[in-house]
Amino acid sequence: MRALWVLGLCCVLLTFGSVRADDEVDVDGTVEEDLGKSREGSRTDDEVVQREEEAIQLDGLNASQIRELREKSEKFAFQAEVNRMMKLIINSLYKNKEIFLRELISNASDALDKIRLISLTDENALSGNEELTVKIKCDKEKNLLHVTDTGVGMTREELVKNLGTIAKSGTSEFLNKMTEAQEDGQSTSELIGQFGVGFYSAFLVADKVIVTSKHNNDTQHIWESDSNEFSVIADPRGNTLGRGTTITLVLKEEASDYLELDTIKNLVKKYSQFINFPIYVWSSKTETVEEPMEEEEAAKEEKEESDDEAAVEEEEEEKKPKTKKVEKTVWDWELMNDIKPIWQRPSKEVEEDEYKAFYKSFSKESDDPMAYIHFTAEGEVTFKSILFVPTSAPRGLFDEYGSKKSDYIKLYVRRVFITDDFHDMMPKYLNFVKGVVDSDDLPLNVSRETLQQHKLLKVIRKKLVRKTLDMIKKIADDKYNDTFWKEFGTNIKLGVIEDHSNRTRLAKLLRFQSSHHPTDITSLDQYVERMKEKQDKIYFMAGSSRKEAESSPFVERLLKKGYEVIYLTEPVDEYCIQALPEFDGKRFQNVAKEGVKFDESEKTKESREAVEKEFEPLLNWMKDKALKDKIEKAVVSQRLTESPCALVASQYGWSGNMERIMKAQAYQTGKDISTNYYASQKKTFEINPRHPLIRDMLRRIKEDEDDKTVLDLAVVLFETATLRSGYLLPDTKAYGDRIERMLRLSLNIDPDAKVEEEPEEEPEETAEDTTEDTEQDEDEEMDVGTDEEEETAKESTAEKDEL
């Protein structure tokens, strides 16, 4: 019995010791979740203690303090307009709740600006707290989000006035704007801050909002509201802030995402990374620290070392405490807005590497920018800006061109991000430019809808465009031609078409291929410099490719005389040139249209007139008989040297290239009356009087105007000229038949000779067919044999009858 009692006692002692050991391990190895306590075990320096106190101050009230607050607080009703306004905010912005944090940080920044301004004239203004910061802390356990600033703070009266009522005129205007925006289906996400009501966006994510504030001229007070009513009471904790304001949000269940550190950090970086004051978030990180070993572990390690070195005798040194490396989670304030707004610094003080680093951080690009410009605009509106040209065009640059919103220009007002969701900061053709615009003259948190009608926007836009074009103009020629033009050339051409006020500046940026060089592109300035002495027009030829353009009959005489011709090979090129009335006093001439004339001497003029008179019978015959319904007129050409003829559009008609483009667009967008009208316009038929075909036609029609061969030749020449001039034939079968007839005549083949009929071949017999035929033949032979036997029998019977 005694043995059993002793055994049981031993088991109890062992179990107690085991539990005790487990408890000790748990205490050492578990990370505490209370944000108000230190996570750094053995560290007790002043810095850690200070951080602990800061964390405790940001925590919510305890149960007894909350009870006292509820019992003794003075209750207030919101103004009727405030109630209506809060409902509008909550109902209109429920899909864009995240802006609440931007509004709270913006208000905190304003409060910090105010106390800093006061401190310039009052040396004791910062005595309560020397720091000028914004701090954010998430408390998942208590479902609280704290935003604290060390700004000017609010007195009791200011809490009631600023958070419970709004100036009536401002409220009415705000409500009208909100209602209009909702009726028009526009975004209201930025409108709330325009009238100083951004604070109420906190109710988008919070069931209850608690504001703790300390002003230098009053004691610390607490304002609390559930959006139906609010209360104000002196803080039973006393002065815990020193100076400033803490906004504590009791988050709704569906807003729990805003207690995630990553979510808060991303929102701060998105909206507030360029605020003038440092913004900190209470966050954790894992660090490796050294801790003293326990006695058992140290003794075990010493034993292992003594066993390994038993053969070596050394003098005993002073024993140092044994330590081990342990990973611990450490909580501390993490700075969020570490990227300083370099556009606020003078451009001379910013290094090139800083611009490149800022661009990569700002645009999320891995390549350096092709070009950038940093400037301050002054005058009617003052703003600072940095603009960048990326190395390559963004993907889908022309997808939904004009309707897709560009998010490459970010608007800041006093370093607070407002929006990148609008059309009007940059014109459509500059939709590849990236950058920031920061203005102190615009209203803080101006909405996108209000911004679009803001008179200062047009001024900002105008200056941005001018500065962008200056930046592009300064790109080195080799980089411009090799890189920029390949990536963004189409944008510049669209700019010439769309931007009337900057058309001359944009024209200087245009580049085209030309007959001057087989591969290099040229500017219009360079073309004008190379023009002949008496040349008064800039000649261009449009085609689907360079090869098509330079082999066109329209450029034959120009190239032979040494004139340079610009080749337009992109669909937008001809539109672009048509939008330019002139360049440097020189008008543009499409060589595929009427109007191409050369400077000629009196002798040359007399010779031309003589040729025109000589070929007048042929010209009249073509216009009145052979091509009566196909051409407007027939003339002797001044532009042809090798080709027999060409089809030329009128000055206001479509060239072959333009007609092809317009018809392709018509097929995509449906029938267009104007397309059919322009396509049906008759054109001028130009002949080359020196070509042997034309000269022989003149001889033949003088002999016989009704010669069918000559009539066919005229039509074939017209249709061939149509194709060579870039137009499409309406009836390709008829054209093919005529070509065939001309070939027959050239080979002395009767035009009416028929094609030989192909002899019909009997189908080859298969094995099955052969078997069936054999069986059929055998049956026929048997039938024949039977018939013969019957006939013989009949004959013998007849003979017997006769006998």
From Swiss-Prot:
Q: Does the keyword Zinc-finger apply?
A: no
Effect caused by changing residue 217 to Q = Does not promote or impair hyperglycosylation
An example Pfam family from this entry, by short name, is HSP90
Site Important for ATP hydrolysis — annotated at 448
Q: Motif Prevents secretion from ER, which positions?
A: 800-803
Q: Name one GO biological process term.
A: retrograde protein transport, ER to cytosol
| Family in the record | Belongs to the heat shock protein 90 family.
How does it associate, per the subunit comment?
Homodimer; disulfide-linked. Component of an EIF2 complex at least composed of CELF1/CUGBP1, CALR, CALR3, EIF2S1, EIF2S2, HSP90B1 and HSPA5. Part of a large chaperone multiprotein complex comprising DNAJB11, HSP90B1, HSPA5, HYOU, PDIA2, PDIA4, PDIA6, PPIB, SDF2L1, UGGT1 and very small amounts of ERP29, but not, or at very low levels, CALR nor CANX. Interacts with AIMP1; regulates its retention in the endoplasmic reticulum. Hyperglycosylated form interacts with OS9; promoting its degradation by the endoplasmic reticulum associated degradation (ERAD). Interacts with CNPY3.
Q: What is this protein called?
A: Endoplasmin
